[in-house]
C-alpha cells in the first residue's frame, strides 16, 4: 500500500467511518482507530471535540486539505451572503479537483488532486493544473485527449461506485463534464454524514 493510500485509510480508521464509501476501506472489517490503542472504547466527545472531529472529517474528505487552505475557504464562505454552512459546501464542491472526482474521472479526491496537478485536465479548452481552481457555473471540464486512455481513468469511468450529482452534467464517452451550478449541502452525495454546522461553530469560537 502506498504512503498516500495509507494516509487516506488512516483517516477512515481515525474517524471509524468509510469516508468515501470505498470497498477496500479497513473500517469495513473493524470499527476502531489506527494504532495499538485503537480498540479502546472512546468516551463521549465534548462540544469542542465534536466540532474538531467534524472539521477534520470534512477537511480530510477533500483530499486532506491543509488547515490554511480550509480556513481560507471558510473565511470566504463566512463573508458571502447567505448561510455560511451552505456557502462552505458550495465552495468546496466548486474546486476543480472536487468536480473531477464527482464526474467519476478518477476514484478518489486524492487521485483527483494528483490528476489535475499532472496536467491531465482542461477547463473551457485551456489546460489547468491547479486543484483548487474555482470553477464557475457553465464551465466545461474535460480530460485531455492523451490522458483518456490512462488506466485510472478507464477503471473509474467503468465502475459505478457512486452517482454523479445533478449539479454536474457528464459525458463519459467524451470524458467531459459541465459544472451546472453551485450545490447545496443536500445535493452532495457524501458517503457519510457530514456536519458543516459544527465546522462553523468550531471557527466561530
Curated annotation (Swiss-Prot):
InterPro entries: Ribosomal_uS4 (IPR022801), Ribosomal_uS4_bac-type (IPR005709), Ribosomal_uS4_CS (IPR018079), Ribosomal_uS4_N (IPR001912), S4_RNA-bd (IPR002942), S4_RNA-bd_sf (IPR036986). One of its GO terms (cellular component) is small ribosomal subunit. PROSITE patterns: RIBOSOMAL_S4, S4. Residues 94-157 form the S4 RNA-binding domain. GO terms for molecular function: rRNA binding; structural constituent of ribosome. Belongs to the universal ribosomal protein uS4 family. One of the primary rRNA binding proteins, it binds directly to 16S rRNA where it nucleates assembly of the body of the 30S subunit. PANTHER family: 30S 40S RIBOSOMAL PROTEIN, SMALL RIBOSOMAL SUBUNIT PROTEIN US4M. This is Small ribosomal subunit protein uS4. It comes from Chelativorans sp. (strain BNC1). The lineage of its organism: Bacteria, Pseudomonadati, Pseudomonadota, Alphaproteobacteria, Hyphomicrobiales.
